[in-house]
Amino acid sequence: KIVLTPDLLEYMCRLNKETGEFVKKITKFYFDFHWEWEHIIGCVINDPLAVAYFINPELCKGFDFYVQIETEGISLGQSVVDSMNFYRKASNARVLTEVDVYGFFQMFLSRILDQEPEELDILQDLIRGDLK
């Protein structure tokens, strides 16, 4: 759900040209990758979400489960979540299932663009796609 869209990227450039252009440059590969493999017009930015969640855990909701990372075979690198407690092992991870998209982008953009959150006046419309 945390996708840096072309509209959000352009908004960043308008608010802080230097930072916006830098973000555009470093995310170009990811924009191309997500389009080629997933047909997403944008760049999924999970790493900033992880940092934002560390700062404000109320941005996300989820559940605690036992999780193991597969280290071989066709599912190499995938997370295996025991959501039904089949293995009866203690939870070792929190699996996040919901995110406050607006809250995240408000925090993210205000910090990297050096803007007060209330100065991001059209952010909610950009996220919802309501701009005309």
What are these regions (language model features)?
Residues 1-132:
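N-terminal acidic, glycine/proline-rich low-complexity segments
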